[in-house]
């Protein structure tokens, strides 16, 4: 595959597999207003605002998937999708009654709206695919250059970033990786150190120049509720740029294709330190934390939760190596929880405020232990009030089974004293950290 920056014209001929995986990884998250979806969920759940019927959403999703995988043009996308939506009644202006019983005239499907759906979703998908490709070669091409189209339609703020270079792991890319707004056409080019020297480019830095604040995204006309989201500005005194409201995020780090695909991709990365940096970035991302919170909220109102699965995070390389040394099998790296486990163990062990932040807790556990008798990993995290310890247990078979990339976890509440006693008796090995005992 040619190592070059991907835009829609190139992708029409050779779409990256990562972009296709990215779209197929998305779930359903139906919203009434676009600002309910916002940045974090853009990369985790497929949404078309006001598409409140599942058949409509499924139809749109199918055509967007085809646009990404087959590289069809916007005109063909509209020509194929429009009659399908018209048949479903999702077209033109209609009087719609929302969940609160309020009626108003809104525009559903239209050529202009389908063009927006096509542009936003294909560019975001290709951005995620390109991000995956560049992270996989970041040891060879560690410098990323922001590239704007620089024509009469380019936003002035986006043009100011044109040709600026940041390292791949700079904080800048967490919020300013394109697209940075509706119909943004910016992209990123990966460069080697030799190419940087050849072009005479200098590295810029985001640290100390990033300012994040809460801003209004919109107001629900039926309830008066104001939706707020994070907006991050880069301002180094010479260049100032703020993405459009709802776009201060990185579509690649938020989704990075499917998590399972990422795990398999990570083993191809040559540099061990780079692999760990990727894992830490993903584990600590606010996108993952928000996605988990949204999942909890949705399951709370559903009676059928048993088969739902949500990723909590990724096992670090050091922990995986420790398991391999003890079992002879390299463990699966993706830690997941399903609805059944949530209902039977997590609710009983964790208070709601602790459960909400479980991905963050697992990203920075107090300790990681190995249960020698049961061959289980134990992630030890503290409750917010500090009165107990929570043990996140991996499934019995931590070794890869049938090429599975995920490990199911369950949660139990234990005392620090009992863990300390088991460690002293040689029943548990301490792999990382230590168990704190309240005095």
UniProtKB/Swiss-Prot annotation:
Keywords: Host cytoplasm, Late protein, Viral capsid assembly, Viral release from host cell, Virion. Its main location: virion. It is found in: Virion; Host cytoplasm. Disulfide bonds: none annotated. Induction: Expressed in the late phase of the viral replicative cycle. Expression of late genes is activated by the viral late transcription activator C. GO terms for cellular component: host cell cytoplasm; virion component. It holds the Pfam family Phage_Mu_F. This is Putative capsid assembly protein F. It comes from Escherichia phage Mu (Bacteriophage Mu). The gene is F.
């Amino acid at each position: 595959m040619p190592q070059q920056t991907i835009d829609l014209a190139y992708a029409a001929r050779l779409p990256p597999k990562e972009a296709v995986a990215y779209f197929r990884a998305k779930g359903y998250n139906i919203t009434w207003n676009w600002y309910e979806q916002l940045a974090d969920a853009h990369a985790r759940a497929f949404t078309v605002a006001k598409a409140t019927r599942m058949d409509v959403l499924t139809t749109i999703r199918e055509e967007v998937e085809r646009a990404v995988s087959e590289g069809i043009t916007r005109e063909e996308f509209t020509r194929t999708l429009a009659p399908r939506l018209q048949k479903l009644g999702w077209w033109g202006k209609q009087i719609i009654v929302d969940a609160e019983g309020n009626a108003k005239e809104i525009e559903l499907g239209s050529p202009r709206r389908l063009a927006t759906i096509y542009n936003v979703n294909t560019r975001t998908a290709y951005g995620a695919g390109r991000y995956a490709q560049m992270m996989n070669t970041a040891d060879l091409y560690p410098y990323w250059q922001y590239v704007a189209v620089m024509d009469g339609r380019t936003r002035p703020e986006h043009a100011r970033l044109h040709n600026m270079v940041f390292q791949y792991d700079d904080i800048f890319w967490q919020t300013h990786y394109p697209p940075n707004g509706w119909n943004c056409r910016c992209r990123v080019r990966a460069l080697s150190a030799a190419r940087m020297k050849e072009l005479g480019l200098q590295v810029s830095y985001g640290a100390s120049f990033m300012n994040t604040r809460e801003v209004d995204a919109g107001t629900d006309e039926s309830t008066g509720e104001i939706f707020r989201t994070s907006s991050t500005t880069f301002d180094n005194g010479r260049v100032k740029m703020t993405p459009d409201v709802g776009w201060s995020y990185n579509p690649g780090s938020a989704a990075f294709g499917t998590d399972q695909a990422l795990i398999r991709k990570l083993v191809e990365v040559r540099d061990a330190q780079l692999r760990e940096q990727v894992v830490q970035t993903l584990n600590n991302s606010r996108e993952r934390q928000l996605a988990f919170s949204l999942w909890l909220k949705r399951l709370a109102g559903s009676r059928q939760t048993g088969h739902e699965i949500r990723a909590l995070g990724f096992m670090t390389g050091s922990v995986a190596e420790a398991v391999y040394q003890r079992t002879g099998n390299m463990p699966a790296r993706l830690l997941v929880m399903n609805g059944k486990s949530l209902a039977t163990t997590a609710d009983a062990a964790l208070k709601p405020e602790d459960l909400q932040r479980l991905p963050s807790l697992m990203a920075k556990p107090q300790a990681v232990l190995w249960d020698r008798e049961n061959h289980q990993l134990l992630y030890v995290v503290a409750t917010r009030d500090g009165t107990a310890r929570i043990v996140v247990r991996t499934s019995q078979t931590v070794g890869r089974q049938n090429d599975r990339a995920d490990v199911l976890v369950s949660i139990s509440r234990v005392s620090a004293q009992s863990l300390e006693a088991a460690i002293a008796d040689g029943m548990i090995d301490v792999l990382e950290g230590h168990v704190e005992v309240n005095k």
